[in-house]
From Swiss-Prot:
Involved in jasmonate (JA) signaling. Required for jasmonate signaling in plant defense responses. Can complement Arabidopsis coi1-1 mutant and restore jasmonate signaling. Component of SCF(COI1) E3 ubiquitin ligase complexes, which may mediate the ubiquitination and subsequent proteasomal degradation of target proteins, including TIFY/JAZ family. The keyword Transcription does not apply. Plants silencing COI1A and COI1B show increased plant height and seed length, are hypersensitive to gibberellin, and display reduced sensitivity to inhibition of seedling growth by jasmonate. This is Coronatine-insensitive protein homolog 1b. Expressed in roots, shoots, leaf sheaths and leaf blades. InterPro entries: COI1_F-box, F-box-like_dom_sf, Leu-rich_rpt_Cys-con_subtyp, LRR_dom_sf, Transp_inhibit. The keyword Disulfide bond does not apply. The gene is COI1B. It comes from the Eukaryota. Residues 22-64 form the F-box domain. The lineage of its organism: Eukaryota, Viridiplantae, Streptophyta, Embryophyta, Tracheophyta. GO terms for biological process: defense response; regulation of jasmonic acid mediated signaling pathway; SCF-dependent proteasomal ubiquitin-dependent protein catabolic process. SUPFAM superfamilies: F-box domain (SSF81383), RNI-like (SSF52047).
Amino acid sequence: MGGEAPEARRLDRAMSFGGAGSIPEEALHLVLGYVDDPRDREAVSLVCRRWHRIDALTRKHVTVPFCYAASPAHLLARFPRLESLAVKGKPRAAMYGLIPEDWGAYARPWVAELAAPLECLKALHLRRMVVTDDDLAALVRARGHMLQELKLDKCSGFSTDALRLVARSCRSLRTLFLEECSIADNGTEWLHDLAVNNPVLETLNFHMTELTVVPADLELLAKKCKSLISLKISDCDFSDLIGFFRMAASLQEFAGGAFIEQGELTKYGNVKFPSRLCSLGLTYMGTNEMPIIFPFSALLKKLDLQYTFLTTEDHCQLIAKCPNLLVLAVRNVIGDRGLGVVADTCKKLQRLRVERGDDDPGLQEEQGGVSQVGLTTVAVGCRELEYIAAYVSDITNGALESIGTFCKNLCDFRLVLLDREERITDLPLDNGVRALLRGCTKLRRFALYLRPGGLSDTGLGYIGQYSGIIQYMLLGNVGETDDGLIRFALGCENLRKLELRSCCFSEQALARAIRSMPSLRYVWVQGYKASKTGHDLMLMARPFWNIEFTPPSSENANRMREDGEPCVDSQAQILAYYSLAGKRSDCPRSVVPLYPA
């Protein structure tokens, strides 16, 4: 939205005359029905008015990457036959407590437009937005009779009262997604009503919420919803789920629950999972409970062990029994030894996530930790990998080179170097990063959060030079001077979204770099050499480019949170983005809109 398509996707305007202009309207409708990539769609719409109109009439899905980038009324008027709409709200940093609660991203302007004109809308996905009970009531009134998919991902502001209204009124729901939402629990009736009124329900997810679960309601859900294939819930003791598992014959994916009384073998001995289950994520599972997975471990395609109490040895034993895994999520307690088992066993693995574990140094020494050794082993052994996200305690250029050499299908790579080790083996990582980017030519998303000295100006220049088709980047503690940032910006021809943290760059250099990146649509920065007013940021001012500055709070300048991170408002932030909606009207006092003024 709001920018030119990359050169390779330009279509000749002359095509609309003579050859392309003679194509029957029905044929164009049919052909465009098979064009889903939004960048291809954008290129089509720029050919001529006729193609622009047909694109508008045939567009079935739109993702708004930032809720303030477009006017709800204008966007929905342009695409009157949308079947699904996704809107993203607060910056990703909100997931890590770096954005104030009152920052904005209110769903109301969007919900208010979802009325009669959108007769085809069946699916709505809101991410990191503030959604109230009134918003959901308005949505039910407007779209409840047609809504088949409602996803509220990491949203806040609503209660189970609104969920009960959704459950009673939206009787065609196939998907209800509420993962990591902050929901006021006013009772469990919503789940009972959902089971009674939605027999076609296929996916229900309220994982990582604090909602109360009544086992009888889950059993009713299994009885009434014969097509239920995916269920992710909040904490509920596994001994209370035996009846549900017995009745949920179609279930293929389950996550949540809890082994509340660990070590009670007799209590959980009767837990039997459905025969079709191939995706599993268990909570609070320890060594003694692990054997309940063994009977069907060879059938598992997805396994999430992030919220278990398993040791390194437990990971090794369990993963050795899972040769068909496509997706694996663990904490770094898996250690290099565990990743060695992954490399030997999981030859089909496509996605690997290694999250940060316990920060207790003693525990890390006992259980291991992930370093260049484990990453290298996985790169060599799991050559189908498309996604790697890992928190590591040590890393080398050689490990990154191995990933570039062997992981040719990699589309998304994210690495965070933890600061618990005093010395890192091999810094800076300039040559390793260059080798990875040159080797992994399919990369579209790239994140690198290092420690001071982790990447020199030369390495930062390599990222720009070899960024290829990368559209999203998160960089932290990279570069040495403003010169490195300018060299980085000379590349990045296809970069659309950039996030920077803990960097040494000046406001002036940031503004110059941002202005010089041709495809950039969104940038968020925290922790840089900020001025009190952000005046140098005006160097990047241009039409349709909103600039918001959050000055540091003098009161909290040196205050730290309990986890050792700076307070939310102790460091200046920049948010700049293309917008066809103009200046937003709901900025909190902590945010200063610089442009448009």
